[in-house]
Amino acid sequence: MKRVLLMAAVALTLAAQAQTYPGTKPITFVVPFAAGGPTDRVARDLAEAMRAPLGGAVLLVDNAAGAGGSIGANKVAKAAPDGHTLLLHHIGMATMPTLVRNIPFKVDSDFEYVGMI
């Protein structure tokens, strides 16, 4: 009986497959500054460089400028935490809590640090 249960358990795990990233959903880089600036340029170059290693994935750059970067940051804070919406910000993000009174997100807990560019 134990052998039959073990074989059934193994058979059930064979149907499970690892999810591939990013799948069919595009990856969006949100740049909280106007198009044509240095942060926008870095995001566009990064998106182009990441296309091939990610198997030709669709990478978009979304400029959400305004309020010193807090509009774009808020957009990312409210996005689904699925790894498909990334924020490309600069040092202003670190000073925002002390300079902006009522930001609609928490800089230290609403974001997950991915890396430095």
Task: List each model region and its residues.
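N-terminal (or domain-start) structured segment
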Residues: 18-116
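Sec-dependent signal peptide recognition
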Residues: 2-7
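Hydrophobic h-region of N-terminal signal peptides that target proteins for export
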Residues: 10-18
